[in-house]
Amino acid sequence: MKWTDAQLIAEELYDRNPDLDPKTVRFTDLHKWICELENFDDDPNKSNESILEAILLKWLDEFE
């Protein structure tokens, strides 16, 4: 997975944390968790606030 795979990343995060409300997650934690995903293989330094926000919004869709 790459940073551009927001939907896939969001689904993985939801599957790992189905009871965690994404609205309570800090971007620093989100970044760390994404980089720790087994299938994630992108450069950790290539993320930015808009990418993390897009992933968080997709995760919120999964959560609700």
From Swiss-Prot:
A GO CC term attached to the entry: cytosol
InterPro entries reported for this sequence: ISC_FeS_clus_asmbl_IscsX, IscX-like_sf
Disulfide bonds, paired cysteine numbers: none
Biological process according to GO: iron-sulfur cluster assembly
NCBIfam families the record matches: iscX_yfhJ (TIGR03412)
PANTHER family: PROTEIN ISCX
Protein name: Protein IscX
Species annotation: Haemophilus influenzae (strain ATCC 51907 / DSM 11121 / KW20 / Rd)
Gene: iscX
